[in-house]
Amino acid sequence: MLFMGACAGQKAVVEAPKPPPPPSATVVSLSLGDVFFDFDKSELRGDARDQLQTNYRWLAENPSRKLTIEGHCDERGTNEYNLALGERRANTAKDYIVNLGAAAGRINTVSYGEERPFASGHSEDAWAQNRRDHFVAQ
């Protein structure tokens, strides 16, 4: 777009700024995702390993950020047992990410046991959603 103006008999031509180029189609946005566990287990499933690799890449691409891994359980079992199981789950995920190359000091763990369910209800579907590690960026 051109703008023309007159000043003391002189004509000036001023070009409007060009719009920025469109973003590259190769930009990939990685985000943190939860990992899920089988009943009464802290071993990683295949889908959990895949998500942990994505979470590791996010951490590698954000060197100024830290993570907290929250270990969670379903409502079955005692509070003490579930706190210990949640801790094992969080530590298993941390160990996996550290083995991929992350600095251990950038990752904290905490267990909430059954205290902070994601899904309400008393069904296998609800319990499966609550047996998880949740990742919080800091």
What are these regions (language model features)?
Residues 1-5:
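Sec-dependent bacterial lipoprotein signal peptides
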Residues 34-37, 82-84, 134:
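Short aromatic/hydrophobic contact patches that present stacked aromatics
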Residues 63-72, 87-118, 131-138:
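A non-catalytic structural micro-motif
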Residues 125-129:
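A generic structural micro-feature
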Residues 73-78:
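Surface-exposed aromatic
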Residues 7-66:
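Periplasmic peptidoglycan-binding/tethering modules of Gram-negative envelope proteins
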Residues 47, 51-54, 80, 84, ...:
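Extracytoplasmic/secreted proteins, especially bacterial periplasmic and envelope-associated proteins
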Residues 120-123:
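Short beta-alpha junctions and helix-cap segments that line functional grooves
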